[in-house]
Amino acid sequence: MLHLSAAPPAPPPEVTATARPCLCSVGRRGDGGKMAAAGALERSFVELSGAERERPRHFREFTVCSIGTANAVAGAVKYSESAGGFYYVESGKLFSVTRNRFIHWKTSGDTLELMEESLDINLLNNAIRLKFQNCSVLPGGVYVSETQNRVIILMLTNQTVHRLLLPHPSRMYRSELVVDSQMQSIFTDIGKVDFTDPCNYQLIPAVPGISPNSTASTAWLSSDGEALFALPCASGGIFVLKLPPYDIPGMVSVVELKQSSVMQRLLTGWMPTAIRGDQSPSDRPLSLAVHCVEHDAFIFALCQDHKLRMWSYKEQMCLMVADMLEYVPVKKDLRLTAGTGHKLRLAYSPTMGLYLGIYMHAPKRGQFCIFQLVSTESNRYSLDHISSLFTSQETLIDFALTSTDIWALWHDAENQTVVKYINFEHNVAGQWNPVFMQPLPEEEIVIRDDQDPREMYLQSLFTPGQFTNEALCKALQIFCRGTERNLDLSWSELKKEVTLAVENELQGSVTEYEFSQEEFRNLQQEFWCKFYACCLQYQEALSHPLALHLNPHTNMVCLLKKGYLSFLIPSSLVDHLYLLPYENLLTEDETTISDDVDIARDVICLIKCLRLIEESVTVDMSVIMEMSCYNLQSPEKAAEQILEDMITIDVENVMEDICSKLQEIRNPIHAIGLLIREMDYETEVEMEKGFNPAQPLNIRMNLTQLYGSNTAGYIVCRGVHKIASTRFLICRDLLILQQLLMRLGDAVIWGTGQLFQAQQDLLHRTAPLLLSYYLIKWGSECLATDVPLDTLESNLQHLSVLELTDSGALMANRFVSSPQTIVELFFQEVARKHIISHLFSQPKAPLSQTGLNWPEMITAITSYLLQLLWPSNPGCLFLECLMGNCQYVQLQDYIQLLHPWCQVNVGSCRFMLGRCYLVTGEGQKALECFCQAASEVGKEEFLDRLIRSEDGEIVSTPRLQYYDKVLRLLDVIGLPELVIQLATSAITEAGDDWKSQATLRTCIFKHHLDLGHNSQAYEALTQIPDSSRQLDCLRQLVVVLCERSQLQDLVEFPYVNLHNEVVGIIESRARAVDLMTHNYYELLYAFHIYRHNYRKAGTVMFEYGMRLGREVRTLRGLEKQGNCYLAALNCLRLIRPEYAWIVQPVSGAVYDRPGASPKRNHDGECTAAPTNRQIEILELEDLEKECSLARIRLTLAQHDPSAVAVAGSSSAEEMVTLLVQAGLFDTAISLCQTFKLPLTPVFEGLAFKCIKLQFGGEAAQAEAWAWLAANQLSSVITTKESSATDEAWRLLSTYLERYKVQNNLYHHCVINKLLSHGVPLPNWLINSYKKVDAAELLRLYLNYDLLEEAVDLVSEYVDAVLGKGHQYFGIEFPLSATAPMVWLPYSSIDQLLQALGENSANSHNIALSQKILDKLEDYQQKVDKATRDLLYRRTL
């Protein structure tokens, strides 16, 4: 229930420092060489800063106002800054919501800053700042406890005590399964807290009153939920203030614990009622701690009189007093002075009981005493002294105690931070294990003449792990002298602001217009140096340590600093030996290195040699090796040059010392090989990917969040950077040492001579090792680039083409607010999931019982991450991650650094380098890389995965599959030239595989066509071995060239063995698409003309014309139809007469097209295809007719646009009707003559128009002129202006005179039309018809009951026969004995007489009848006379 930062309960003592694999002999890791004895080997630790390069942490500020506090006191009390931390009870359990979660805080004056951290998830709203009005927070006066539902924070100031209630994380989320990458902190809803609630705060009473100069305090929760605060009394002793449970009303009470008696004061209105004793203040507590047992609490007080007192709160009595000076060897001076600086810590183990750690401070020395609390049956207590540990460091800032270890934090005489730890049970020699602290950035930046000061300073300021964002922001604010600036800046924005600020200061100081380059450079360096010094000052201030935070559940140790949090991680054995001070190597336990003492001594001597070399290497020498790695030069030659320089400047005989140490090594070659093998992370088997599918889903999902926060990622990667940096130096010094060995030859070796070849082999093994660590170090410092969303989406599309989007290396990119290094990006996006799944794939114990041990976990994770980053290992997830997250520049640089010396994953690297070149627009370089990678297909895991198809089916050789993927990628990106080049290269690989050949040649064809390389496209098409693909490509060629109007190329290609196919394709297209927007018929016509196939050309154009008439009802369509028929006619005229014919396309036929739906009848059944169609042959004459008809259609459409819709497909007979309706009588007559049709419709139509004009108004007259003008009228001289009616009658007259036929059919039909409409016949028409057929005219009169006109006609006709006006009736010879016979239409005359006689009552009719009878009488007499004369003449 209760866990205090001062005395954290410890878990069972399992592992306090992780066991390391010991050095083994030369050869593979694990081969030969006996490991060191099993057990927990004590190692040094390394400090890693947890200050990410994010924006300064955003604190939400709240003011805590307490009624009754005095203003004067706040200003009078000055407390030092302090810090502390709290770990959740289940923070070490694998499936707890509070796993890897903790709270830490910092106090300064009236301010308390609280932060909640998690190594698994990113917590939101996790930082608050509380300001206590008129109060100062007691150093260490913050205590955090947790219950099942709540987290309770107890806070003490110099005037008040406070209780803050927050929800427990287990009650904040719906499920215990945490799967989100971001979650709310317990501080999220703190804005709802009422800090003035009297139930949760109270003033410290003036009596007994807090000791004015004391900072000791402790607080805890009772089993009943009461909040208790223990403080030193002003008069000595302790008083305890109790707040009732937050949910139960109650009184506040104060209990004063005194040596002589126990007095309790119930506080009512805070009036003092207790009696002061004469107690001396020498028993005033310097440090307080509490340990809860069931329903009691033991309060331990380390007092000024150097005594430890133990109080029972329940019994309110002192249970034990122990004089600590009894355990101090030199105590005379201490007994005479009051104690200062003593500190007390508790540690509880369920198995071992309660441990007390006491630090006794004395001038220039200090001592730790470890005790175990022992109780007897009679409830008496005593201390069992476990250990005393001495230290020479003067100023102890803080220490932490577990049931096995002490961790201590000092400031030494040079104000440097020192952290050490020791196992107080087993360490007989009292040897403290060091923690290698993170050094501050270099005080001075050395800039060579060839370097730009600004670039070098910016590089130093913004290199990951150097300066925190907060230090840079504060320096910027000071440097700009209070200028208003927005300091909520991202890393890149801050870099711009810094550059701008320094450059502005530089410009502002310039007073002259002209500078020499050297003067400007010096001035520039001065200002940058000034800003750098300012940053260094703030970084140093923020790095000031305040406290240690130790979690016994996970054995995680943190260092709480003024500006940030740092973590301590264990060193590997090699790093530990190399980083140890030289003097510590003298006392290093050899058994921790190897069970073989000789091997262990050789290794220690070797390390001593390396340390001597490291101390002799100057900054310039170090740069030589760095630059040789960066410039891809030989590390061996660089080491040789450094050795030469060391020998040259060796004034302290260091080389002699090294040679002396080498003499002590029994087997240098073996020792060096051992060291190399220990540092080599090369493996032959790639790490498994993904979680064990046998594990339940909830377990797998829970594990996916383990160490998933930005903080954890940053720490892990800083750990990798630290290892890589240290190992790089070790390898560098090893190379130098090996060069020295080469110089010395066999002289240095005792016993038998060593082979020169063995030395060479070691040299060639060390160089790749050094380059590997350099590459990892470089990646740990190289910042990732923030990528726009559209670039990520485009990249994802490209990767989907390669079917790589399901790869573990290519997850959705989610950049954090701060820039990451590419190694951080890799860990967070890819590696963490692989490592965690690997760690928990085969657990030794059930996962539910698995506890998290920080040293073990961080060691394993960094080790596996190094394995994944190791350049010579088979997998290349790191490169895939960079490629998947668009880190192309970084990927390019990485491969460039890797390429010359690493021959693993060469093909994969070339492929990814090709992807980089594609992005940067260097297509030819990309193509070269892709071709180079092809040779490695089948040899590398990444390339094998690249070519693996989704269905697992292998359709061609691996290399061809690779080419196929790359071709698809180039196609999606839109690089047809590269596609052609690569496909051409791949054809050679295809060999006799005709399917692959067809695919590749089709690809070449397609992209040549896209580029407009028509000839090359045709050539590629002719080489496609698959006829089906070839036909598809041919169809595409036709369509594309038509769309581009590149018809000449299309027509002129030879089409060897493809002639019928191309004709079929064009015909099919012609019949399938719109006639007016595509010109496939004209293309086909040109195609046949180019090949002199005129009959087919004519057939094509005739079909085109037919369809135009049927489908295109526009004037343009009719024009094209005429031209088509004319072209078809010309084609046939070019052929010999016997071959000048074509087969007429079936009118209205639907041509079969691919994909066309079958035709169905009304019942839905498919109609049977027509069979045995009759073939119609069209000859030249038929075409001429069609051509004439097409011209006439166009004429009609031009004259009458409304006729366009019906004219196109109309027959000749229908066209005559349309022309007559439109008034185009000349055209109609021409059409009738061409097609040998009667003119009857023309005359009837013209007669009808005359009738309409006769009775129409002016509108009809005006309209008539339009169609009259379209007919050729013979010019007639007239004395008066003719009307449209007159002109129409004249046109009719002209036609009747011009177009005469047998039986005078046209006169008959005209007169019949007129009479049928009751129109009187014009005289000219009557006279005209009398001349040709008077008898028929008579019959027409009778048909329409025109009796009077009939009588007149008969009278005139009889007179004409008898010789009077015979020329008007076309009678050449009238009646005479010498003339030919004449006749009268007696039948018609009889009908007339009968009709007149039918109405005998009508006198007019009787008169008319008599008139005819008289005429006939006269006629008959003259006939009789003429007959007699004729007979007479014959007799003569």
Swiss-Prot record:
Q: Work out whether the entry's keyword set contains Transport.
A: yes
Q: What is its main location?
A: nucleus
Decide whether keyword Phosphoprotein is in the record. yes
Arranged from A to Z, the UniProt key words for this protein are:
Disease variant, mRNA transport, Nuclear pore complex, Nucleus, Phosphoprotein, Protein transport, Translocation, Transport
Q: Where does this one sit in the cell?
A: Nucleus, Nuclear pore complex
Q: Report the protein's function.
A: Functions as a component of the nuclear pore complex (NPC). Involved in poly(A)+ RNA transport.
Q: What is this protein called?
A: Nuclear pore complex protein Nup160
- Species source reads Homo sapiens (Human)
Upper lineage: Eukaryota, Metazoa, Chordata, Craniata, Vertebrata
